[in-house]
Design a protein with these regions (language model features):
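HKD (HxKxxxxD) catalytic microenvironment of the phospholipase D
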Residues: 121-174
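Extreme N-terminal leader/targeting regions
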Residues: 1, 148, 185-189
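Short, flexible coil/linker elements and helix-boundary hinge sites characteristic
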Residues: 24-25, 47-50, 121-122, 146, ...
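Cysteine/selenocysteine-centered motifs that mediate thiol-based redox chemistry or coordinate metal-sulfur cofactors
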Residues: 172-189
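Primarily the HKD phosphodiesterase
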Residues: 40-119
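N-terminal localization/anchoring segments of enzymes in phospholipid and broader phosphate metabolism
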Residues: 1-51, 71-82, 143, 152, ...
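Surface-exposed beta-strand edges and their flanking turn/coil or helix-capping segments
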Residues: 69, 107-109, 158-162, 176-178
Length: 189
């Protein structure tokens, strides 16, 4: 079943799509406007997979998104099985494609907001061409991959299809492909 995600109730509708994917073969498709609401999407996505290793691959990343990532890296949850507090996002690979004019400002902001986590080895920042937007997160129990076409904020708003996958196999494939960029396109901040 394909649905259209409305800005008014983003998290609620995404949770519904996640439930559909988990019940219906591991995949759910939905439509949304070309701009992702990252300040709502990222907390929902990573909160659905606590203790995850994750990849964020976006063409354009603004200061607000960097701030949201910093907030997520600082969040913790209580792991009942281990009996301890752990970070919601254990390790993050961030892949972006800044324009030449924005690259220096983006690097400074990434360093300012995420420098602590970069120094700890929990965040790896890469710059490379990005063919599609992708979020991937997995924690051994739950695995999510959200894919869509590239950011198109310079265009008129239009609906685009996105795919939410809950299979471990899809997560492994996405992580292998995107992790390789973490090794070859890593930048020092």
């Amino acid at each position: 079943m394909n649905t259209v995600i409305e800005p008014c109730c983003y998290s609620k509708q995404l949770t519904h799509n996640l439930e559909l994917a988990e019940k219906g073969g591991g995949v759910s498709h939905f439509f949304s406007f070309s701009d992702w609401s990252t300040d709502e999407l990222l907390p929902w996505f990573f909160g659905s997979v606590p203790g995850c290793e994750a990849v964020v691959s976006l063409v354009q990343i603004d200061f607000r998104t960097i701030y949201v990532l910093q907030h997520l890296m600082s969040r913790t949850y209580y792991d009942r099985e281990a009996g301890e507090t752990r970070p919601v996002v254990g390790r993050l690979t961030l892949i972006t494609q800044p324009s030449r004019t924005d690259a220096d400002a983006q690097r400074r902001e990434l360093r300012a907001q995420l420098g602590k986590y970069i120094d700890e080895g929990r965040v790896v920042v890469c710059e490379d061409s990005v063919a599609f937007r992708c979020l991937a997160a997995g924690n051994g129990t739950r695995h999510l991959v959200l894919q869509g076409s590239i950011n198109q904020s310079h265009m008129e708003p239009c609906t685009q299809m996105f795919t939410l996958t809950t299979s471990k196999g899809a997560w492994v494939q996405a992580m292998e492909m995107l992790r390789s960029k973490g090794k070859t396109k890593h930048i020092k901040l």
